[in-house]
Regions:
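Glycine-rich ATP-binding loops of the HATPase_c
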Residues: 165-171
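N-terminal intrinsically disordered, cationic/polar leader segments
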Residues: 3-17, 97-99
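Short C-terminal beta-strand
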Residues: 179-188
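Conserved short strand/loop->alpha-helix "switch" segment adjacent to the catalytic nucleotide/phosphoryl-transfer site
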Residues: 44-68, 141-146
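Helix-loop-beta hinge of the Bergerat
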Residues: 20-54, 122-134
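Conserved ATP-binding N-box helix of the HATPase_c
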Residues: 57-92, 157-162
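Glycine-rich/acidic phosphate-handling loop/turn and adjacent ATP-lid/helix
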Residues: 95-150
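Short beta-strand element(s) in the Bergerat
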Residues: 26, 96-100, 181
């Protein structure tokens, strides 16, 4: 008896997936739970992939810095964020530069708090970002009860500083108290 090792449906889904990644020019993607070990491995793999593209060192540093902060802020497991579901992390490259995408399911209230922090960061110029960064570092040293909020805003400030761009975000309703929260950062 001959065993079927594949089906047309599987091949079609692979072809659809490949066409989608090619169309959007994704060079790196991951979907799953983000443990510390997974984050380390993702950073290592993405670094090798970007090195192979032979980009300028300044661009590599920007991308790597944004990646680290996205993975720490948006993707990693945190009880405070109100989610233990899979995260998604993507990098694409086109003629305009690189785009980093990160997202995960969150409780609605946490997503709205995160969007408020991003809106606050997006309104600041570079000097104001530096001032806010210093202020939050001082607050963090006091180990206040807003520890995770201060860590989050520090990561968002780093993303804005390194990319030199606004942080774009999207909140999509998924179910009762949950939303899918994603960010998109352009790096030139």
């Amino acid at each position: 008896m001959v065993e079927t090792l594949y089906s047309n449906e599987l091949i079609c889904s692979y072809v659809d997936f490949k066409n989608t990644t090619d169309q959007h020019k994704f060079i790196f993607s991951f979907r799953g739970k983000m443990s510390h070990a997974v984050v380390k491995n993702l950073l290592s793999m993405a670094e090798k992939k970007i090195d192979a593209l032979q980009e300028a060192e300044t661009v590599k540093k920007k991308i790597f810095g944004v990646m680290i902060n996205c993975l720490q802020t948006i993707c990693t497991e945190a009880k405070e964020m109100g989610s233990s579901t899979d995260s998604i992390f993507l990098i694409s490259k086109d003629s305009a530069g690189f785009t980093v995408f990160a997202g995960r399911n969150l409780l609605s209230r946490m997503a709205h708090k995160l969007s408020e922090l991003i809106d606050e960061v997006n309104q600041l110029d570079r000097n104001s970002l530096l001032d806010l960064h210093k202020e939050k570092l001082k607050e963090l040293q006091k180990l206040s009860e807003s520890f995770t909020i201060d860590e989050t805003i520090l990561s968002l400030i780093e993303i804005a500083k390194r990319s030199g761009q606004r942080i774009n975000y999207l909140i999509e309703e998924t179910e009762a108290d949950n939303v899918f929260f994603s960010i998109k950062i352009q790096i030139n």
